[in-house]
Amino acid sequence: MSLLTEVETYVLSIVPSGPLKAEIAQRLEDVFAGKNTDLEALMEWLKTRPILSPLTKGILGFVFTLTVPSERGLQRRRFVQNALNGNGDPNNMDRAVKLYRKLKREITFHGAKEVALSYSAGALASCMGLIYNRMGTVTTEVAFGLVCATCEQIADSQHRSHRQMVTTTNPLIRHENRMVLASITAKAMEQMAGSSEQAAEAMEVASQARQMVQAMRTIGTHPSSSAGLKDNLLENLQAYQKRMGVQMQRFK
């Protein structure tokens, strides 16, 4: 896996699924291929995107700034600076300075990532902030190692909270989680269907699932009633994907 492919993989792991994720993936590919060289326009586009957390926007802004050639005096963007300030916690800033000193001694992507992984996401974001604000300089490869370590910490935390959600014993939480997952799967089916001739069935299944979830939320039902909802949807999606010759990896 090339360095830029690895960076793209890690960055996209913290972006919520949906049409915006596909759009961001395309922008990253264009930037890494040298096809998009207008940093100002890119940053303005990023700033106004919905759904993304401030930290995710900050990380993407940092990656764009590292990659797109720009005039030396180009002004730094406030939304990126605010996102990469470690929540204003002085402890994060102290750790960021210590990490920065270690990163200065690193020359490889993997070396930098390994060093950075022992720090919290807050300290890592602060360290990115130091570099973004030109208070310190490291090689692009080392900066990318820092980016990927930060994304890994965030993705691990999201994964842990997802696992806790799945294994929780509270039936009301599990019920709501099943409905949320069913809605997400329905959305995935609609996105995959597009305008193909075989799409009618997938759209119909997705539409029925949405109506069922809406009805459950509106009138209230027993928590066990949603147990098969997500599984039925996934089975329908898998059957549809087999017919379309699409692999199931994205929506497991």
UniProtKB/Swiss-Prot annotation:
Region Membrane-binding, annotated ranges: 1-164
Record localization: Virion membrane; Host nucleus
Ranges where the record places region RNP-binding: 165-252
Membrane topology: Peripheral membrane protein
Motif Nuclear localization signal per UniProt: ranges: 101-105
Record function comment: Plays critical roles in virus replication, from virus entry and uncoating to assembly and budding of the virus particle. M1 binding to ribonucleocapsids (RNPs) in nucleus seems to inhibit viral transcription. Interaction of viral NEP with M1-RNP is thought to promote nuclear export of the complex, which is targeted to the virion assembly site at the apical plasma membrane in polarized epithelial cells. Interactions with NA and HA may bring M1, a non-raft-associated protein, into lipid rafts. Forms a continuous shell on the inner side of the lipid bilayer in virion, where it binds the RNP. Determines the virion's shape: spherical or filamentous. Clinical isolates of influenza are characterized by the presence of significant proportion of filamentous virions, whereas after multiple passage on eggs or cell culture, virions have only spherical morphology. Filamentous virions are thought to be important to infect neighboring cells, and spherical virions more suited to spread through aerosol between hosts organisms.
Note: Most abundant protein in virion. When expressed alone can form virus-like particles in transfected cells.
The protein's name: Matrix protein 1
Species of the source: Influenza A virus (strain A/Turkey/Ontario/7732/1966 H5N9)
